[in-house]
Amino acid sequence: MDHQLTREESQRLMHLLKLPMEQYGNFPLMRKAFLRACKIVHPDKGGSDELSQELISLYRRLEESLPCLSTQDFIETDILQIPSYGTPEWDEWWKEFNKDFDLFCNEAFDRSDDEQEPQPDDSAPIILSPTYPARSQATPPKKKAKMDSPNDMPADLMEYLSCAILSNKTLPCFLIYTTLEKVELLYNKLSEEVLSPRFNQVDHKYGRKYVPIFIITGTKHRVSAVFNYCATYCSVSFIVVKGVIKEYPLYCHLCVEPYSVLQESIEELNSEFFDAPEDAAKNVNWVAISEYALKINCDDIYLLMGLYKEFQSPVPNCSKCENRMLTNHFKFHKEHHENAFYLQLVENQKTICQQAVDGVIATKTVDMAQMTRNEQLAARFDKLFERLEVILSAQSSYTISMFMAGIVWFENLFPGQSFKDLLLELLECMVSNIPKRRYWLFTGPVNTGKTTLAAAVLDLGGTIYISDCYLIELEVANSQIHGCVEVLAEKVKIRLPPGQGINNLDNLRDHLDGAVKVNLEKKHLNKKTQIFPPGIVTSNEYFIPFTLRVRFCKKLVFKFSKYQYLSLKKTECLGRYRILQNGCTLLLLLIYHCDLDDFAESIQGKVRAWKERVNSEISVSTYLEMRQCCLEGRYSVCTKYSNANTAQ
């Protein structure tokens, strides 16, 4: 190596490699330094072309003077000279290879008892050949001691344990199975650190060296988390951990033969720490909650949770059941009391109620897709009949006289016009749903009854209410259109701050037309395409653009009436009980003035019953008297009937 490079060249090479001269000859280190230096001095890396050529030239000259340092070359050369095993050439090569080695040992060993093979003749040397390989005298490795440990829990405990292998479910109770020596350590560690055992340590008498530990933790954990924690203290000893699904039965089973309690942190546990055996199998009835939400037509998750929470109170002393005013309570309290008690114990109350609400929305969607609009309106009338049964019960503050006062107020709203015919025409427009013939415009001065009538129609047909037509409110309202029969857009403004009502409504021309389906969005749900429902638009005396005027089939002009204003002011019960905004008022108006054949056949029985009840309590003379009082701006509820009903 020194003969290829001069002293000066060697020093120059080590300088380029940035190595001290003491490392000259340490070829592996010089090789690494060479590769590193090539990256530094290479022209493409910003180095010098002259230094790069000088480094490579010196290193190549040094490398040529060295013998082959790769063992792979020797191995490949040696392998090429050895013939294939099992051939006559290999036998000849093997004899030639071993001819200079004398492995004979003139020595005798005492024969052990377990040796079965005969000793070879001492006079002949042992020849190492493929046919007679030499016997090794090395000490064989010791076999690992076989641990006779169980792989699973005792069979009599399996019915109380979870057999899930790959599960992320968290549990509060676990059973740990390990050796008797590790039990005391684990019991103390579980008490001090991660987990807190509430009770007991039990001796398994089938071998008396394996012991289960039954623990309950403050919070829920995965089985794998408990196993990993215990495994840190059981590197040699076996450990089995399983979740407990029947806590109290397992505890009782471990307290009797063939088990015995060694130690427990709380003595003589009772069922209060667990679910009772008869209650363990009981769960919240999701179907019952879904059926309840469907019966009361509740699509608000928080309202449903609140209503169902009221069922937890005892039935005998419930004031709402005694008053019998809220049908969504007193009709279902007794039936759902027990299920409401179990609902308060679970953590996924919102999930359960959300599923029930989704079921209501799904039912509405199916009804909209399969039922005709006549059938939908008849179903709405049927629900209003149920409401009338409740609010006109014996314990209610409502009276038929109040509703008749509301009827005569509506009949005097448009002098010279039949309000019954006007209402029937409006309902016919909503039911027929003809494109560009489906929206009505209520316009007029302030405080003339536009919103009052529109709200009553809204409650009669089951509509959605849009106030002022703000853009953000329209976006929210679009998500609520699903399942609606009609729409009310109220207080549409123009040229007044903020004054964007007409502009926003003008952007909904396709919605108002009803000729094509439009996309309706709801949060967290996909877009739904449907015909936008018909409806009513209320507005003050503003200019309506032509693009909107052509989409209104009728325009009702409201005018201020002093006698209507005074009558409403003096008849306080109409405002206090919101009689005029109640759809039941318009329904009773139709029942009172229309023939039985004008109604759908499915509800004619209820119409006949209510017509008889109204005629029996309100005579024709009483009705005419109430109407005259309204025209004169006086108290319009029949005083005689009202006092008689109050005395009762």
UniProtKB/Swiss-Prot annotation:
UniProt motif (LXCXE motif) ranges: 103-107
Co-factor requirement: Mg(2+)
Lineage, broadest ranks: Viruses, Monodnaviria, Shotokuvirae, Cossaviricota, Papovaviricetes
Free-text description of this protein's post-translational modifications in UniProt: Phosphorylated on both serine and threonine residues. Small t antigen inhibits the dephosphorylation by the AC form of PP2A.
Keyword tags: Acetylation, ATP-binding, DNA replication, DNA-binding, Early protein, G1/S host cell cycle checkpoint dysregulation by virus, Helicase, Host nucleus, Host-virus interaction, Hydrolase, Inhibition of host innate immune response by virus, Inhibition of host interferon signaling pathway by virus, Inhibition of host JAK1 by virus, Interferon antiviral system evasion, Isomerase, Magnesium, Metal-binding, Modulation of host cell cycle by virus, Nucleotide-binding, Oncogene, Phosphoprotein, Viral immunoevasion, Zinc, Zinc-finger
A GO term from the CC aspect: host cell nucleus
Record's function text: Isoform large T antigen is a key early protein essential for both driving viral replication and inducing cellular transformation. Plays a role in viral genome replication by driving entry of quiescent cells into the cell cycle and by autoregulating the synthesis of viral early mRNA. Displays highly oncogenic activities by corrupting the host cellular checkpoint mechanisms that guard cell division and the transcription, replication, and repair of DNA. Participates in the modulation of cellular gene expression preceeding viral DNA replication.
Cofactor comment: DNA helicase activity requires Mg(2+).
UniProt subcellular location: Host nucleus
GO biological process, one term: symbiont-mediated suppression of host innate immune response
Residue positions where N-acetylmethionine is found in the record: M1
DNA-binding stretch(es), residue numbering of this chain: 154-272
Enzyme Commission number: 5.6.2.4
Residues binding ATP, per UniProt: G444, P445, V446, N447, T448, G449, K450, T451
Source domain of life: Viruses
Motif annotated as Nuclear localization signal, chain positions: 140-147
Domain J: 12-75
Residues with PTM Phosphothreonine: T139
Keyword ATP-binding among record annotations: yes
In-chain residues carrying the UniProt-annotated modification Phosphoserine: S112
Metal-binding found in the keyword field: yes
Protein's name in the database: Large T antigen
Domain SF3 helicase: from-to ranges: 418-573
Free-text note on domains in this protein's UniProt record: The J domain is essential for multiple viral activities, including virion assembly, viral DNA replication, transformation and transcriptional activation. The LXCXE motif specifically binds to host pRB, RBL1, and RBL2.
Annotated positions binding Zn(2+): C318, C321, H329, H333
